[in-house]
A protein has these predicted regions:
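Metzincin-family zinc-dependent endopeptidase catalytic domain
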Residues: 42-167
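Metalloprotease/metallohydrolase-associated module, dominated by Zn2+-dependent proteases
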Residues: 23-24, 33-49, 113-158, 170-227
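Residue-level marker of intrinsically disordered, low-complexity segments enriched
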Residues: 1-2, 9, 74, 88, ...
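Residue-level marker of positions within ordered structural domains that often coincide
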Residues: 6-8, 57, 173, 188
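Residues at or immediately flanking beta-strands
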Residues: 31, 60-64, 182
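Generic detector of intrinsically disordered, low-complexity, polar/charged segments
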Residues: 12-15, 88, 106, 178
Length: 227
C-alpha cells in the first residue's frame, strides 16, 4: 500500500539551530521536471525553485529545473545531468492529503512510497502554503497588509524549503525523518519564514548517502548535441 510522507508545518516559534555543511560533491546537476497550476504566479515558481536550490547548494548538490513548456533547445543546452525521473507538481488545489491537519500542523508537500521506494512525483500545495502563512501571523504579521512582493518572498521560502525536504526523501530513498535539519518531520513557522536556513541543514551522512545513490545510478543523460 502506498504511504504518503509529508512535511508538516507547525505554527510555533523557535530559535534557529544547526549549521550549514560545506559543499563536498562534484556530481553533475540533477534534472527535475516542474509543472505548476495556472493559478500559481510564474514569479513565485521561480523563487520557490531558487529557495530549494539554496537549501541544497551548500551540501554540494544542484538542480536543473526543466519546465514542461521549455523549448527543446533549452533542454539540449542544459549540459550533462543526472536524470532520475523526478517530477514536481505545484498545485493550487487541495489533493487528498492536502487538508490533513494533526496537532496544529499542516502538510505543505508530500511524496508517496510504495514497497519502500519513493514515487517519482512530489506534490507541493500552493493553497496550503498560503493558509499556513495566514495562520502564522504571530511570526510574519498580517498577510492582508503585506505588499505583494513581500508576500511572495515569504511564500517562496516556505514552499522552497518544503520542496527541499520532499526532494530529500526522494534522493535518500527513505521515509525516515531525523531529529534535526532538513529531514525533520516538522518545522516551525520561525524556521520556515526566517531569513536563515540553518534549520534545514543537510548533514554529512545524508550528503554521502545521496551522493552514493546518485553515483550508482546509470541514468546519466548527456543533454547536448552529439557531434
Amino acid at each position: 500500500m502506498p504511504i504518503i510522507t509529508s512535511l508538516a508545518a507547525a505554527v510555533l516559534a523557535s530559535a534557529f539551530t544547526g549549521a550549514t555543511a560545506p559543499a563536498t560533491s562534484s556530481l553533475p546537476p540533477v534534472t527535475i521536471t516542474v509543472s505548476a497550476s495556472a493559478a500559481v504566479p510564474p514569479t513565485l515558481v521561480k523563487r520557490v525553485l531558487e529557495e530549494t536550490d539554496a537549501v541544497w547548494r551548500p551540501a554540494g548538490f544542484s538542480f536543473v529545473w526543466r519546465r514542461e513548456t521549455d523549448p527543446v533547445r533549452a533542454r539540449i543546452d542544459a549540459g550533462p545531468c543526472l536524470a532520475p525521473g523526478l517530477r514536481v507538481t505545484i498545485g493550487s488545489g487541495r489533493a487528498a492529503d492536502a487538508e490533513r491537519r494533526h496537532e496544529n500542523t499542516m502538510a505543505l508537500g508530500w511524496i508517496e512510497f510504495d514497497d519502500g521506494q519513493p514515487d517519482s512525483e512530489i506534490y507541493l500545495s500552493y493553497d496550503n502554503a498560503q493558509a499556513y502563512m495566514i495562520d502564522s501571523r504571530g511570526i510574519v504579521g498580517l498577510v492582508d497588509r503585506m505588499p505583494i512582493l513581500e508576500r511572495e518572498f515569504l511564500l517562496a521560502r516556505v514552499m522552497g524549503r518544503a520542496l527541499a525536504h520532499e526532494i530529500g526523501h526522494f534522493l535518500l530513498a527513505s521515509k525516515v525523518h531525523t531529529a534535526r535539519g532538513l529531514m525533520m518531520a516538522r518545522h516551525t513557522a520561525s524556521e520556515f519564514f526566517g531569513y536563515e536556513r540553518s534549520g534545514f541543514a543537510i548533514d554529512a551522512a545524508q550528503r554521502q548517502a545521496v551522493a552514493a545513490r546518485l553515483r550508482r545510478s546509470s541514468a546519466v543523460a548527456a543533454l547536448h548535441d552529439v557531434r
